[in-house]
From Swiss-Prot:
Species of origin: Rahnella sp. (strain Y9602)
Membrane-protein topology: Multi-pass membrane protein
NCBIfam families in UniProt: PRK10631.1
Any GO CC annotation of this UniProt entry: plasma membrane
Function per UniProt: Forms an efflux pump with AaeA. Could function as a metabolic relief valve, allowing to eliminate certain compounds when they accumulate to high levels in the cell.
UniProt xrefs under Pfam families: FUSC
Name used for this protein in its record: p-hydroxybenzoic acid efflux pump subunit AaeB
Length: 652
């Protein structure tokens, strides 16, 4: 009980300190709108907690704060450029802001998720500044400077609060995860060698892929904590690739055992007879495997088992370095510098385009409503629309995030009304009483945010926004209710646009991912040494994880993707005869595979796919002509048969 309650109370204190510190500092520096600094502190502090479902690890708040500063400065510069260029045409000015917000949302959907926050923020910051200064364009530079000042103050307060209230380090969690990873790797190989059921294999490798991906995500959080983890970061990056390699080799062993169970000797099987109890047990078994493999003839040892043993040995070496954070030895240096990791290319281009279109459409509707009705609070409505659509588009569940804002903004009306009409007038302009009232409210909201309670983040931001905190405080009830209704209507409009502009890119993205798996397997055929050093496994498993998220119940897609990853790894290790004609054929096959991936219509895709199958058939004949060994011809034949058998999955 205490282990759960203490982090929640600590985070609630952190959130309260950050918001109150930003508010008091804003009043002290006589900022125009000190509530923006308080809102910044609230969003920067509570956002990572909502995503983590608890107190965020050390560094997460600082990283988010720096991204917010970058996004704010980019948005301010964009706003100044738009106003200077179109100050005499207000409609064009607002239209350009809507286009800018849509472009930023589109771009944020294509880049890495941890960096997309800055782009999303840049989109709606420009809109906020332009809308705020619409009545007096000459004051736009002043609004931009004030906006940046408020953001920086809010972020500084959030960082100070994060440092004061014992930020939780992720290092211990990484050490535990690394140890468990080695046990899970041995468990998967044990199931594969002993020819377990497909259900056991699917469950084991699925969990192992998820834990490997999670460990790589922890690596980013660790680097946010301190620069002293640089060595640990390098080892974790190498361990990620090594772990994926071990998963691939274990699954290939299973496929080989299904057709040729005699390929693994009884002596080797005996070492996988019993499960490993701890890391020391895994270390002992790997040592026995190395000794046994060394004493056997290479033709009698399955290549995947030998490669898995070597990768496991490297993983244990990296694990020890991760847990001690010691200096990198010469042996480790060879492991760390062995391969060049290739970054994945986004397959969600159509999805990103839909996200940008949603943001543009929603903000345009808000601006048109503002221009048509002349509603005094329509500007606040437009701002909320931009904020909700920009932030929601970056999440795996945009509708869920939008619903969180709707519930929060609706709850903010009664909660904010009680605070504005009853509690705040009773404070009699006392800053201490105001901070006490807001502190109690923020503390309980902070506890609920760590529980991922629906609507709490929206309630916190919405309440701070509609209170319009100023010094001295002006209690205009009509203006308050107008602002409250404006932000509530804005969230409803944003949700309506999300429902109307549907994202139908799921099937297209899934087919693109499968075609990229196919292309990577075919492209692994090479005689070039530099191409063999390229490590595509992290990118391939990243795309496999996307398939897991998009098609959680389609096990057939996972198995097909995994077989293509195995084919890629086998092709990469194949010793293709060095020959100019074969090298030219490799280039030709890669070019055709790229056309299959990039083909826009079904007709073109089918044409290039059939051409690829024909070229692979000709390539097999060339391999026989140049006396290629069975270790080369057999993987090519298996890949060709697989592409022939499952061509409906790549073309449908």
């Amino acid at each position: 009980m205490n282990s759960v309650l203490i982090p929640r109370v600590r985070f609630a204190c952190k959130l309260t300190f950050a918001i109150l510190g930003a508010l008091v500092l804003g009043f002290y520096l006589q900022l125009e709108t000190p509530r923006w600094s308080a809102m910044t502190a609230a969003i920067v502090t509570s956002g990572p907690a909502l995503a983590a479902g608890g107190e965020p690890f050390a560094g997460a708040i600082r990283h988010r704060g720096f991204l917010r500063v970058i996004g704010t400065f980019i948005g301010c510069i964009a706003a100044l450029v738009i106003v200077i260029a179109t100050a005499r045409a207000p409609v064009v000015m607002l239209l350009l802001c809507c286009i800018w917000a849509g472009v930023c949302t589109w771009w944020s959907s294509l880049v890495r998720i941890e960096n997309s926050y800055a782009l999303g923020l840049a989109g709606y910051t420009a809109l906020i500044i332009v809308v705020t200064s619409a009545s007096s364009p000459l004051q736009t530079p002043q609004f931009a400077v004030e906006r940046c000042s408020e953001i920086v103050i809010g972020i500084c307060c959030a960082i100070v609060a994060d440092l004061l209230f014992s930020p939780r380090s992720i290092k211990k969690d990484i050490d535990r995860a690394v140890s468990q990873l080695m046990l899970d790797q041995f468990a998967l190989m044990r199931i594969c060698v002993n020819s377990g059921t497909k259900e056991e294999i699917d469950k084991s490798w699925n969990n192992l892929v998820k834990s490997t991906t999670a460990l790589n995500g922890m690596r980013g959080s660790l680097m946010m904590e301190s620069s002293r983890w640089q060595r640990c970061n390098r080892r974790l990056k190498a361990l990620h690739s090594t772990s994926l390699s071990m998963i691939t080799q274990a699954c290939e062993t299973y496929l080989i055992m299904q057709s040729s169970p005699e390929r693994v000797s009884p002596e080797l099987k005996a070492l996988f007879a019993e499960p490993a109890e701890n890391v020391a047990d895994v270390h002992r078994r790997l040592k026995q495997l190395r000794q046994m493999i060394t004493g056997m003839h290479s033709d009698n040892v399955l290549m995947t088992v030998s490669a898995w043993t070597g990768a496991g040995t490297r993983a244990l070496l990296l694990m020890k370095g991760i847990q001690t954070n010691s200096s990198i030895s010469a042996i480790e240096s060879g492991v760390l510098d062995g391969e060049v990791v290739v970054r994945p290319v986004s397959a969600e281009r159509h999805h990103a385009l839909v996200n940008g279109l949603r943001t543009f459409t929603a903000t345009t509707i808000g601006c048109l409503m503002w221009l048509w009705t002349g509603w005094t609070s329509a500007s606040g409505c437009v701002i909320i629309i931009a904020v909700v659509t920009s932030l929601a588009m970056r999440t795996p569940n945009p509708k869920g995030m939008a619903m969180d804002f709707i519930i929060g903004m609706l709850l903010a009306i009664p909660v904010g009304s009680m605070m504005f009409m009853l509690i705040m007038p009773a404070t009699q302009q006392s800053l201490f009483l105001l901070c006490l009232m807001l502190g109690i409210f923020t503390f309980f909201i902070g506890i609920e945010v760590t529980k991922r309670r629906l609507g709490m983040l929206g309630l916190l931001a919405g309440t701070i926004n509609i209170l319009v905190l100023s010094n001295p405080m002006v209690f205009n009830v009509t203006s308050f209710l107008d602002n409250a209704m404006g932000q509530a209507i804005g969230t409803v409009i944003a949700m309506a646009v999300l429902l109307i502009v549907r994202d139908k890119s799921r099937e297209k993205t899934g087919r693109t991912l499968l075609n990229r798996f196919m292309s990577s397997a075919v492209s692994a055929l090479t005689t070039k040494a530099y191409r063999r050093r390229e490590n595509h496994l992290p990118a391939l498993y990243h795309q496999l994880n996307q398939l897991l998220v998009m098609f959680p119940n389609d096990i057939g897609k996972y198995r097909l993707a995994l077989m293509l990853i195995i084919a890629h790894q086998r092709m990469k290790l194949a010793e293709v005869p060095v020959n100019d004609e074969l090298s030219a054929f490799h280039k030709k096959i890669r070019n055709t595979a790229d056309h299959v991936v990039s083909a826009s219509g079904e007709g073109k895709r089918t044409y290039y796919y059939q051409r690829l199958l024909k070229e692979l058939g000709e390539y097999q004949e060339k391999l026989v002509e140049y006396d290629a060994p069975l270790k080369v011809t057999e993987p090519v034949r298996r890949l060709t048969d697989m592409l022939q058998r499952y061509q409906h999955a790549f073309l449908a």
